[in-house]
Amino acid sequence: MFFDVLTLFPGMFASPFADSIMGKAVKRGLVQITAHHLRDWAEGKHQITDDVPYGGGEGMVLKPEPVARALRDLRQRRPHSRVLLMTPQGKPFCQESARQLAGEESLVFVCGRYEGFDERIRSMVDDEFSLGDFVLTGGELAAMTIIDAVGRLVPGVLGNRDSAASDSYSDGLLEYAQYTRPAEFEGMKVPDVLLSGNHAAIARWRRQQQLLRTWLRRPDLLERACLSDEDRRMLQELQRQADSGEQ
């Protein structure tokens, strides 16, 4: 899968994808991440990419011409690219977004800087994404996050293909609690069921933990989650136990 990034700071992308899982994926050729300097498509002696805003105001605004030239060039190289704009005004990025984007052949990220970007740039992209209700100094960190979230879903990137299936949000719920050795640490014990070897009981406990943790921490997710009748029965019982102080 190809990831192309339009940015004024291409050096930011070297380190995050040099190591760990994504670093290995790059070395194996499963993903290709290329950060392009937007100034390469700017014209004139000074290769200006931003200018003062019409109507006055603070900061500088990213000009539309370099972005338009860059996107035309990149789309010629990879005609099936989907272009994403990183902006606080975009739709919230979530695990379902990552799953959908992982089905694309190529993604292009447009990273804003300074005060923002010329409104006409919006007409050049396919989607606008935001990481949340906060503002970063630029779109680069958002692009890195989305590349990581999407890239790990590319076939072959994760060593165990079932790993992504059990992640938080993979089925609309938070992940169950995880434990490893030792069985007891500073008085805190691993739940007996995980040491029992009873796979059916372990699976049921893990599902209960998913439901309970989601209800306690992100109840909004339950409204959208696809729950079975058994899930609903377990959730009602967990809620009853919590209300009666049995938990």
From Swiss-Prot:
S-adenosyl-L-methionine binds at G112, L131, G132, D133, F134, V135, L136. SUPFAM superfamilies: alpha/beta knot. It is found in: Cytoplasm. Its EC number is 2.1.1.228. The keyword Cell membrane does not apply. GO terms for molecular function: tRNA (guanine(37)-N1)-methyltransferase activity. Keywords: Cytoplasm, Methyltransferase, S-adenosyl-L-methionine, Transferase, tRNA processing. One of its GO terms (biological process) is tRNA N1-guanine methylation. CDD domains: TrmD-like. Pfam families: tRNA_m1G_MT. Specifically methylates guanosine-37 in various tRNAs. Belongs to the RNA methyltransferase TrmD family. This is tRNA (guanine-N(1)-)-methyltransferase. It comes from Syntrophotalea carbinolica (strain DSM 2380 / NBRC 103641 / GraBd1).
